[in-house]
Amino acid sequence: MSAQLQPSSGRCPIDHARDDRKSASAAQGGLLAAPEVTSFDAVRAVLRDTDARQAGFKAEVILRYRGRARPPILYLHGEAHRRQRSGTARFFTPRVVETRYRDLMERTSDALLARLVRDGSADLDRLSLEMAVTVAAEIVGLTESDIAGMSRRLDAFFSTTFQTGRGKFAELMSFVLGQWRMRRFYAKDVKPAIAARRAAPREDVISHLLSEGYTPLDILTECFTYGAAGMVTTREFITMAGWHLLERPELRAQFLAADADGQIAILEEILRLEPVVGTLYRHVEGGTVALDIRAANGDATAVGTCPHALDPERVRAPRVTGPGLAFGDGEHRCPGAGVALHESAVFLDRLLRIPGLKLERAPDVGWNPLVAGYELRNCRLVVDPT
């Protein structure tokens, strides 16, 4: 199945007013007040601008308080970024994902779903967090601690309950709480992993960073970055994709009947429609701008007619990919995009084949201003044995 099939006519095959987005009503933007850039071409141009600098997502706080630590790859630019990116790229290639991590994805999915069937019910958002943390932890090298405990620690750090409001006092409280939770993450998860990799290096990110002379503080900030990108956001996407597929029997059937490429095409279209991170920030000449990924991914000149409808066979403009700008673009495009899509496909394919599986309760939809993205909680699944 092609990711970009051609319909028999240029006419929009569905209602022009149709809006399949489930997160639109919750979208609010991020913590920074900045002029918005909304068109697809303009947003992509800023993302590809080599003179633009990262902003938002605690960039200023981390760069200010990191002491002598190197900034994580998320905040590097130019030659420093290219050098570090090339050093870690081998952990995210399609071949490595297929040969090294697919078995882990399958085993983890099978274990989680066996528990769902045994218990008769579970929250999809909790299952997806454990799935995402397990896979990302293996790639990064955070394998010397309890996955369930690490999931809770990361969830506490990035959850909306961690947000304390606006203003100087709120910023101070946010920083203090963040430092405490960061120290717990280091003590429980990062420090044991560093010790194990020093004793016996493996093919993972922490071993690579140690070989490059990174200090424990350097590695902590890098793991924090991967914790957000590789774990928390993937958790939200798996839950969102599962919600769409469970509520639309015809889409579920299409997904289960598709080959691997066809399943990825459906997931990419869901991600285009529901980008997990709705706003990215950049420092450019003249100040800071807010890049509205949701608006850009709904730009009909780029993604085709009926931009708010879920249509895996939509015709896009040339050089516009399936997920649009949901994974970013330019030098900071998400390196783990293939991992996220692959593990989502593996997990959801197995989930949706469970006999008697039903969505008992649609999730609560919230908004996390720290990552400028939606949060889905209490998405209840049940398995009816009859």
Regions found by a protein language model. Give the residues of each.
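Cytochrome P450
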Residues: 1-386
